[in-house]
Amino acid sequence: MPTIFSLFLIISCNRKEKQSTFLFEHGGIEREYILYVPDNIQPKAPLIFVLHGLGSTSSYIREYSQMDEVAKKYGFVVCYPQGTESGQNSIHTKKGSSFWNVGYDIHINEYVNDVSFLKSLARYLQEKYNLDPRKTFCSGMSNGGDMSYLLGCEAADVFKAIASVTGCMMAWIYESCVNNAIPVLQIHGTKDDITHYNGDMKNKDKWGAYLGVETTIDFWIDQNKCLGSMIDTIGFTHKSDSSYIISKKYINGINKNEIWFYKVINGGHDWVQKPVIKDFNTSEEIWRFFENFISLNNLDT
């Protein structure tokens, strides 16, 4: 049984919403997470996890994503879990850098089971705060996006849809993920110099082989048996900015599942927000994607 310890409660002078950091004991390890619960949250509200990138923190992705503001506006709970610290130096990271265990080559000697941890934490929060298990989702950036894909394959019983921002699908996850239909959102820049848009199946960067973005999307389209598609373009912010987004939505899949893909032309390794792209906010789009799942399945009644 997981044990919960309250570390500290941060409440700003002009806001009533609960903003807390806790410890959650799992597998003999005390794991940290930040929880944002808007004031007057309704029973059976949605729960969204937001996972940080490699070497980052839960507090950083919270500030960077500004998901609290979206949660306050639309009425859902946000959990920002903290990854564990690596036990040794590597060609990419220093000892002690935080990570989600998706099987990178640099983590070959790391054995933490983050799938089990995140599933257990989600179930605890569902019960503790009376949140709807049918409306529990996961999103993440970079390594957190990679982890979201792993959850999509191994934890779809808990996380009903996933969103990956600048993340990838490791080759080993792709090879082991069979007959699993789950809604997926991917947001990725074509000039991402960290998680390459075209992947790295030859493992030149020594992370471990991973698929290109479009191959990954094709995989999930096939998994969900989507029968239709829609394409749109989200325009420039200003004339000197060459970035824009091609939006592709694949619809009418198994259980009404949809695959949304935002291809950020000339985009980098970013959680895209205004003013980079006019009228586009990644956190808002993630919620819109999850809300679409809720609506299609009549879960908001």
Q: Which stretches of residues belong to each language-model region?
A:
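A fold-wide structural signal in alpha/beta-hydrolase
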Residues: 75-79
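Active-site glycine-rich loops that stabilize anionic/oxyanionic intermediates
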Residues: 53-57, 267
